[in-house]
């Protein structure tokens, strides 16, 4: 079965700030989008790459990834207002043919081959997978500034991307979410959350990630990513 990577690069980057959109900021001479695309281009188990970008930036992004350097890129499409909208547009663009699909945030440019391969292997036996790392910090629950609970740390993992699914599974989960008037107020902020909420019978397998697979949220994160690339 084919495996397609969807690089989600349609975020607004409000916390990052600056005149240049975050996904077009450079890290070690390449934009954040290119780092993610290059990682999936190099992955033997990836058959195609679809890039979802901010409306108005598609021309710039096409110039970066449809220049012959990345042969697996099949298209660049406009995303939506929210991450959920962007995911749904990607699902529609992938069509009806069954495949495995990995959704990856372009804001995580240091994704490695071991993690990608782990997702692909897991999808050989599972219908949904999510990359996770253990939490080294104690996580607490709070309401109105008052601590209300302290979940067991050994039961907590931090989510990263990629998140992978059989296409028909993630498509069905989003169909159910779209039909639910209460979805926009739910805690399902990513695709694994949508599956957990609307297809509880589908097990979501945890795939070990890496602390290097950090998310670029603030300008200072670029400095840390540069240091990690230098080793």
Regions flagged by a language model, labelled:
Residues 75, 80-143, 155, 159-161, ...:
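Conserved beta-loop-beta/alpha segment of the NTase-like Rossmann-fold superfamily
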Residues 34-98, 180-181:
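Conserved N-terminal catalytic core of the sugar/cofactor nucleotidyltransferase
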Residues 16, 61-62, 119, 139, ...:
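Hydrophobic packing residues within well-ordered alpha-helices of enzyme cores
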Residues 1-58:
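N-terminal glycine-rich phosphate-binding loop and ensuing alpha1 helix
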Residues 47-49, 100, 127-128, 203:
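Residues at the starts of beta-strands that form the adenosine-phosphate
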Residues 6-10, 51-52, 104, 131-134, ...:
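Short beta-strand segments
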Residues 50, 108, 128-130, 148, ...:
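A residue-level structural signature of the nucleotidyltransferase/glycosyltransferase Rossmann-like core
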Residues 158-231:
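Conserved alpha/beta core of the MobA/IspD/sugar-nucleotide pyrophosphorylase nucleotidyltransferase superfamily
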């Amino acid at each position: 079965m084919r495996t397609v990577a969807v690089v989600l690069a349609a975020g607004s980057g409000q916390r990052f700030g600056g005149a240049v959109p975050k996904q077009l900021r450079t890290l070690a001479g390449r934009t954040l989008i290119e780092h993610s695309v290059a990682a999936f281009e190099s992955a033997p188990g990836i058959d195609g790459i679809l890039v979802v970008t901010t409306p108005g930036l598609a021309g710039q992004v096409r110039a970066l990834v449809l220049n012959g350097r990345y042969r697996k890129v099949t298209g660049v499409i406009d995303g939506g207002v929210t991450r959920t909208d962007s995911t749904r547009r990607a699902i529609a663009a992938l069509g009806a043919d069954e495949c495995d699909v990995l959704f990856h945030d372009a804001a995580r440019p240091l994704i490695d081959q071991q993690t990608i391969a782990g997702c692909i292997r897991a999808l050989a036996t599972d219908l949904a997978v999510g990359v996770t790392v253990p939490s080294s910090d104690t996580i607490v629950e709070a309401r109105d500034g008052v601590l209300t609970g302290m979940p067991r740390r050994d039961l907590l993992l931090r989510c990263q991307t990629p998140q992978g699914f059989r296409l028909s599974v993630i498509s069905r989960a989003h169909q159910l979410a779209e039909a639910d008037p209460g979805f926009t107020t739910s805690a399902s902020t990513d695709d694994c959350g949508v599956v957990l909420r609307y297809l509880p019978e589908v097990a979501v397998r945890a795939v070990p990630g890496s602390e290097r697979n950090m998310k670029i949220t603030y300008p200072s994160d670029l400095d840390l990513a540069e240091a990690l690339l230098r080793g």
